[in-house]
Curated annotation (Swiss-Prot):
Subunit architecture: Homodimer.
Name assigned to this protein: Dihydroxy-acid dehydratase
Any single Pfam family the record assigns to this protein: ILVD_EDD_N
Cofactor dependency: [2Fe-2S] cluster; Mg(2+)
Length: 612
């Protein structure tokens, strides 16, 4: 049986100095026989998804210590993509994922912790911690801060979210009073933004990967029920330590739980619920850390057979995460996928022997457990707050309508093919991705004229300045991981296209990425990126581009000979923007760009460069 990792610094005469320091943190003689469990918290007052996490690390710590462990909390950074968006701050968002992963590794390995409880929530924090957990491969439990309640206003018949505020602000026909009302109403509580954006998508995927408890992705941040997830996570971390270190059961290690089948399950869920395209980027990165051979071709294969069973904002205005929870949360979607023969149910989870066992216990259409039904009735209170667990509102009934409800059965799917697709062609030889859940069927096949912008800033200026017309395909390039650097999100350009009435009349292609709040014919992650010699860097104004989602293709309608001539010319000039950009690129960002790979590899570091 493996020794506690922490014995490195807690046992032996020569560790007297280290033990003296441990004692200074409050440890006693008896504590040196217990597992040391790191709590990676991500509390910050900058981010609504994390503003309520301040005391939750110690909540978990107390539960760990009651269960027989020693808890030690530390913090990571957390960037708010919504606040960082639309200016140079967005250059730091994706690179922060690597910083978070590294910081968790640094703290856990420097202090020889035996296990981790990861308290995450928003866009890059859950992926960063997931990468670290799979890199370290010690017992781990994820528990996130939970989703925000949807906003309410008398000016709209549907729930509001961040994207609604952005769209009305850019719509010249909306009064200042309406914009102000949406601004004040869109984000009413603490928690990750209320739709199926990147943060909520990733927190849902941790359930499918088997690394978090049921309800982690859908239980509202404000609801009292969420406290139980934190308490159970603390107890579970100690239990996993006992099974691994005490009994030699390595099935509890994250790489043995999040194996190839589990990654397929996570991607299957993502496709079925129309999650953010960013999840593709993060799952590819996590798979590399887990040494799982899961790549873009696997995602392409799954996208062709998995139907869309759930539609949530921004793909539809009617439903938000609180509605997903009322419909039974993630395990109800997993249950429908399992009944459709689309899920691996023999994989283990941190809380159940198998996914099949977990579905039987937690799918509201299978279980008769009244406690489970009560749990999924947890609903919004509609009271603005920044306090976790501050309300106990219940829906009067569950949404178990699998024909016309929020979550559908395979037989009543929103669409036969899922909400995400991978496209290939001469403009993206290594692939690009589109959230089909947010694309109107009338433009699933679209041919248009390229309108070139060498940066997001230039595109925003062009769209707001009416340079983009119906039938155009907006090309935003040199915004990839290396070229940005940092692979900015393009939520502003897509929102402004909507506000200009062009949401169903234009397309957008970029080597950058999109916010989970994006909808419309928005194609990102074009690989190779322009800065790496990708063909997106060869497109010229007026070129025709054909997008064909049903056939999973995207092609620049230019001859191979012409492309070869353009490539030879570009090689001479160097792969950089044709127009200068007023962009501050710090040493930290330059270091990131030096090692960054294109999006088809998850935008992770190029290990070949590091290994020499």
């Amino acid at each position: 049986m493996p020794d506690y990792r922490s014995k490195t610094s807690t046992h032996g005469r020569n560790m007297a100095g280290a033990r003296a320091l441990w004692r200074a943190t409050g440890m006693k003689d008896e504590d040196f026989k217990k597992p040391i469990i790191a709590i990676a918290n991500s509390f910050t007052q900058f981010v609504p998804g994390h503003v309520h996490l301040k005391d939750l690390g110690q909540l978990v710590a107390r539960e760990i210590e009651k269960a027989g462990g020693v808890a030690k909390e530390f913090n990571t950074i957390a960037v708010d993509d919504g606040i960082a968006m639309g200016h140079d701050g967005m250059l730091y968002s994706l690179p922060s994922r690597e910083i978070i992963a590294d910081s968790v590794e640094y703290m856990v390995n420097a202090h020889c912790a035996d296990a981790i409880v990861c308290i995450s929530n928003c866009d890059k924090i859950t992926p960063g911690m997931l990468m670290a957990a799979l890199r370290l491969n010690i017992p781990v439990v994820f528990v996130s801060g939970g989703p925000m309640e949807a906003g309410k206003t008398k000016l709209a018949s549907h729930g509001l979210d961040l994207v609604d505020a952005m769209v009305v602000a850019a719509d010249d026909s909306c009064s200042d009073e309406k914009v102000a009302e949406y601004e004040r109403s869109a984000c009413p509580t603490c928690g990750s933004c209320s739709g199926m954006f990147t943060a909520n998508s990733m927190n849902c995927l941790t359930e499918a990967l088997g690394l978090s408890l049921p309800g982690n992705g859908s239980t509202l941040a404000t609801h009292a029920d969420r406290e139980q997830l934190f308490l159970r996570a603390g107890r579970l971390a100690v239990e996993l330590c006992q099974r691994y270190y005490g009994e030699g059961d390595d099935s509890v290690l994250p790489r043995n739980i999040a194996n190839f089948k589990a990654f397929e399950n996570a991607m299957t869920l993502d496709i079925a619920m129309g999650g953010s395209t960013n999840t593709i980027l993060h799952l590819l990165a996590a798979a590399q850390e887990a040494e799982v051979p899961f790549d873009l071709r696997d995602i392409d294969r799954l996208s062709r057979k998995v139907p869309q069973l759930c539609k949530v904002a921004p793909n539809i205005q009617k439903y938000h995460m609180e509605d997903v929870h009322r419909a039974g949360g993630i395990f109800s979607i997993l249950g429908e996928l399992a009944r459709g023969g689309l899920l691996h149910t023999d994989v283990p989870t941190v809380h159940s022997p198998s996914m099949a066992d977990a579905i039987a216990q937690w799918d509201i259409t299978q279980t008769r457990d009244e406690a489970v039904h009560t749990f999924f009735k947890a609903g919004p209170a509609g009271i603005p707050t920044q306090t976790a667990f501050s309300q106990n509102t219940r829906w009067p009934s569950l949404d178990d309508d699998r024909a016309e409800g929020c979550i559908r059965s395979v037989e009543h799917a929103y669409s036969k093919e899922g909400g995400l697709a991978v496209l290939y062609g001469n403009i993206a030889l290594d692939g690009c991705v589109v959230k089909t859940a947010g694309v109107d069927e009338s433009i699933h096949v679209f041919e248009g004229s390229a309108k070139i912008f060498e940066s997001q800033d230039a595109a925003v200026k062009g769209i707001l300045g009416d340079e983009v017309k119906a039938g155009d395909i907006v090309i935003i390039r040199y915004e990839g991981p290396k070229g940005g650097p940092g692979m900015q999100e393009m939520l502003y350009p897509t929102s402004y296209l909507k506000s200009k009435g062009l949401g169903k009349q234009c397309a957008l292609l970029t080597d950058g990425r999109f916010s989970g709040g994006t909808s419309g014919l928005s194609i990102g992650h074009a690989s190779p990126e322009a800065a790496a010699g990708g063909a997106i860097g060869l497109v010229q104004d007026g070129d025709k581009v054909l997008i064909d989602i049903p056939n999973r293709s995207i092609n620049l309608l230019v001859s191979d000979e012409e492309l070869a001539a353009r490539r030879a010319e570009q090689d001479k000039k160097g792969w950089k923007p044709a127009a200068p950009r007023a962009r501050r690129v710090s040493t930290a960002l330059k270091a990131y760009a030096l090692l960054a790979t294109s999006a088809d590899k998850g935008a992770v570091r190029n290990k070949a460069l590091l290994d020499g």
